[in-house]
Amino acid sequence: AYLRKPYDTLKVYNSALNMCKYYFKCDELAQIPNEKGKIKNKFRRSNSAAILAARPNLINGGIQFFNLDKNKEALDFFATYVDIAINPMFEKENLLQTDTVLPQIAYYASLAAAKMEDYPSVLKYAPYAKEDKEVGKYAMEFISTALKAQGDTVKWIASLKDGIQKYPEHSFFFGHLIDYYSNNNKFDEAMQFADDMLA
């Protein structure tokens, strides 16, 4: 009967987020060997089950904050969702391969980060979305933009070339690469790249 009463959804989402962070820290500390060199992590199974049960609320919380244009909070939720997939607590679940929603959530994490110009977070989360049919090209666009903003020209150019190879119909990569070549009078490199593309 108590479930029929209204409740504060943001509090529920924040509780799920805080629980995940708390259990991550508990697990990290439980993995430290004792004085005999043994690791006794007796709460890992129950904590990981609780995190997996709360994980959908991370998506909901991220979406709610994203829609409120609170990108910092949205990133926190989306990033934690992705971080669960790469946390050692969940090795057996193989979430990077089995979670079909993860690439989209990684995309939203990188989008929220990009809106704040948090380029380290863009570079951490966007790669998980690169292969997605719907959002992969945009994730690669975020990566390129972040690399350029950080002043890493070599990696930026490489990311543009990767983007052209993977998503040739998406004009962002080609346009920026041609702009780079023409603005820096690198016409020979531009011709060589065009020849390589045609080969």
Residue ranges and their predicted role:
Residues A1-A106, P120:
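Short coil/linker segments at helix-helix boundaries
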Residues A1-R4, G62, S110, I143-T145, ...:
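Conserved small-residue packing positions in alpha-helical repeats and bundles
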Residues C26, Y81, Y128-A129, D162-G163, ...:
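Canonical positions in the second alpha-helix
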Residues Q31, I86, K133-V135, P168-E169, ...:
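Short coil turns that delineate tetratricopeptide repeat
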Residues F65, A106, A113, A146-L147, ...:
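Residue at a conserved register position within TPR or TPR-like alpha-solenoid repeats
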Residues N94-L95, V101, Y108-L111, Y138, ...:
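Canonical tetratricopeptide repeat
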